[in-house]
Structures are given as C-alpha cells and as structure tokens.
A protein has these predicted regions:
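Single conserved hydrophobic/aromatic residue that forms the stacking wall/gate
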Residues: 1-11
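Active-site neighborhood of phospho(di)ester-bond hydrolases with catalytic His/Asp-centered motifs
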Residues: 13-15, 37-45, 65-68, 127-131, ...
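Gly/Ser/Thr-rich loops at beta-strand to alpha-helix junctions
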Residues: 18-19, 45-49, 184-188, 216-221
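Active-site metal-binding motif and surrounding structural segment of the metallo-beta-lactamase
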Residues: 19-66
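Conserved hydrophobic helix-helix packing surfaces used for dimerization/oligomerization
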Residues: 40, 103, 126, 211-213
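Metallo-beta-lactamase
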Residues: 67-189
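N-terminal beta1-alpha1-beta2 submodule of the flavodoxin-like/Rossmannoid cofactor-binding fold
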Residues: 190-250
C-alpha cells in the first residue's frame, strides 16, 4: 500500500492467489484503518497476481482499477462477468497523483506477459518491478540471491532478452533507491549489482569463462569419454570445466 492523501493498492506488492483473497483483504483493511482505497493498480494479469481483483471490487466497489489497454483486454477475457464501475487506462510514462506521492507508469511488455508495466514512485524512488528482479525461495533460508534469482529469471523471462533490455534502458533513466518485485525480497543495497546481472543475462552473455559438458550415460561408456575429454581440455589449459550427468543432477 502507498498511503497518501489518496490510498492506492498495488497488486505487485499485495494481491495474491484467490485462495488467499480473504487474508489479503484483511491485511489491506488493517493497513487502511477504516479508510477506503482509491486505486488498485494492476501491473500483471498472471492469475497469482490478478485473481483477487474480483474480491477487491466486491469489498471496495468504489475503487478505480488502473491499467493499460492490454490490461483491460485481459481482464475482460479472464473475468467476463466482472463489472468495473471506475477504470483508468494509462499510457507509457503517464503519472498518477496521489497527493504526496506521484506514480509513473513504465511499460514492460513481455517481461513476462504482454500487458506488464512497472510503477515508479517518484517521491520515495521505489520501483515496483512486477516480475522483474524476483527470485524463488523463502526469506528464512540463507542463500545467495543470485542462485535462485538466476533460476527464476531463466524460467520466467529467459527467452525474452530484448524486452528485458528495453526495460533496463528505461530503468536507467530513473533514480531508483529500492526495487520491490512480485516474487522474492525487496532489494535495497548495491542495486547496480542486480541491474548488471540482468543486463548480462538478457544479452545471453556468460557470467564467467568456462566449459560445461552435459551428458547421459546408460552403460558408463559416454561418461568415460567425457572424463577423457576433460583431461584433454586440462592439457590445453582449460581448467574451468564442469560436467553434469543429466540423469543424476537437478
């Protein structure tokens, strides 16, 4: 929630799968403390983020749904019986005045669906990045951000390098102090690290020089050949060689 002279709910931070709609709405009610929200911004129509739109409208029928043209096309397709009394169709770089907060909408098609847009809070310098900069895992598990973030990136937008590059170019024009993704922790420190990784991944560049050999060996002969190949590579001073048995690795 962004709390200003007008209340705004952002789906990228709060909306959940429909199985958790009641819990989500209770959390919103507690935060608003009796006040009514003015806007619900829909950044991404994937069901794990959009499924609570119907429940939100039922509880707050006066709320204005904010999205782009493609957003509302998909809402009509996903929820054909849904009646939206108030809607605001925004364009690229259009801003929404919330009183002491100003939100700027930046379109990010195909990161990860065609309707995706991210939202930038010009006051607090926060980028609500939709599916961008997310990761798998839980907050109570100590692990390097990059491992599950890389796996998440490959699974969500790995084949959409050009759209990610387009979003990065737009993000470079913003003064970002905080990144709030749909999935995973809020990013607040060393943001250039995360941006540089997304730049590298979306350009399909390797993170380090090396050789990867993936194999499957039913009788062990192919494995023996792979091990011999590794020796040959080492003899030619290629030492960063990693092998993976596809039948036994995750």
């Amino acid at each position: 929630c962004l709390v200003g002279s007008e209340m705004c709910i952002r789906d990228s931070m709060d909306t959940v799968d429909e199985h958790f709609s009641l819990e989500w709405l209770k959390n919103i009610e507690d935060v608003l403390n009796g006040k009514l929200p003015s806007y619900l911004i829909v950044s991404h129509m994937e069901p794990d983020h959009s499924a609570s739109i119907h429940a939100c409208l039922k509880k707050y029928p006066q709320i204005t749904i904010v999205g782009n043209t493609k957003t509302f096309q998909m809402i009509d397709q996903f929820f054909p019986d849904l009646i939206i009394e108030n809607k605001l169709v925004v364009k690229e770089n259009e801003q929404l005045n919330l009183g002491n907060h100003q939100l700027k909408f930046v379109f990010a098609p195909m990161v990860h669906w065609p309707e995706v847009m991210v939202t930038y809070d010009t006051k607090d310098k926060v980028l609500f990045s939709a599916d961008g900069f997310g990761k798998f895992g839980a907050l109570d598990i100590e692990e390097d951000w990059i491992d599950e973030a890389r796996r998440y990136y490959i699974g969500i937008v790995g084949k959409y390098g050009l759209p990610v590059q387009n979003l990065l170019k737009k993000a470079m024009l913003l003064d970002i102090k905080l990144i709030c993704p749909l999935h995973g922790p809020v990013l607040s420190d060393n943001l250039n690290y995360y941006l540089s990784l997304y730049d590298k991944w979306s350009k399909y560049e390797s993170e380090e020089d090396g050789i990867v050999i993936c194999f499957n060996s039913v009788y062990g002969h192919t494995k023996s050949a792979v091990l011999e190949l590794v020796k040959v590579l080492h003899n030619h001073e290629y030492y960063n060689v990693k092998i993976f048995d596809l039948a036994r690795c995750d």
